[in-house]
């Protein structure tokens, strides 16, 4: 089954966009976890120092 050049490009573009979407979601999740952990650590440190 021969694909035209345009069809190949289109399928590649769809794959790229889904990959970007997943990596963006993953980055957001990791960043969210990092921010939450950082905030809780900062709160604990402040509580230990000033509490």
From Swiss-Prot:
Membrane topology: Single-pass membrane protein
Keywords: Membrane, Transmembrane, Transmembrane helix
Keyword Membrane (UniProt): yes
Compartments reported by the entry: Membrane
GO cellular component terms, A-Z: membrane
Bilayer-crossing regions: 20-42
Protein name: Putative uncharacterized protein C30B4.09
């Amino acid at each position: 089954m021969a694909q035209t050049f345009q069809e190949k490009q289109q399928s590649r573009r769809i794959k790229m966009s889904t990959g970007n979407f997943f990596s963006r979601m993953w980055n957001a999740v990791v960043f969210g976890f990092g921010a939450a952990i950082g905030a809780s650590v900062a709160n604990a440190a402040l509580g230990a120092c000033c509490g």
